[in-house]
């Protein structure tokens, strides 16, 4: 029987494509515990910014609720697990479910290229 996945949207509409990617990312098993899944991701100053889903550190005031904007700590490593990128940062492990349409993938590729120089 399929597992039921509940998403609460508080501040961002999500396209069908993004929703499918979030569901696929969330049912996969990862080698480390995942802090949150990120949609509409882009890279800025060696950090990832995007829309957070299924964050492990929700509180009573709904901080970090599904659909809220997330800004990670500095990215320490990035690796592909299955079809998704896993980011290890100062404050947790994040899975990129989808990139922001206009600059997301390009900013991520720039981060990967800058890491290759070292």
Model-found features: residue ranges?
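Short, compact, well-ordered microdomains
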Residues: 72-118
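Short, conserved turn/kink motifs that form compact alpha/beta structural patches or helix kinks used as
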Residues: 52-82
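Feature for intrinsically disordered/low-complexity regulatory segments and propeptides
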Residues: 3-50, 54-60
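Generic N-terminal initiation segments characterized by hydrophobic and/or small/turn-forming residues
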Residues: 4-6, 16-19, 67, 100, ...
């Amino acid at each position: 029987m399929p597992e039921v996945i509940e998403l609460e949207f508080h501040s961002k509409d999500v396209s069908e494509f993004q929703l499918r990617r979030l569901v696929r990312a969330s049912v996969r098993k990862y080698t480390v515990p995942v802090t949150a899944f990120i949609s509409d991701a882009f890279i800025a100053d060696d950090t990832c910014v995007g829309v957070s889903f299924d964050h492990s550190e929700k509180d009573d005031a709904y901080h970090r609720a599904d659909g809220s904007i997330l800004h990670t700590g500095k990215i320490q490593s990035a690796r592909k697990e299955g079809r998704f990128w896993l980011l290890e940062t100062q404050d947790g492990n994040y899975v990129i479910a989808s990139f922001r349409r206009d600059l997301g993938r390009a900013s991520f590729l720039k981060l990967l290229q800058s890491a290759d120089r070292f």
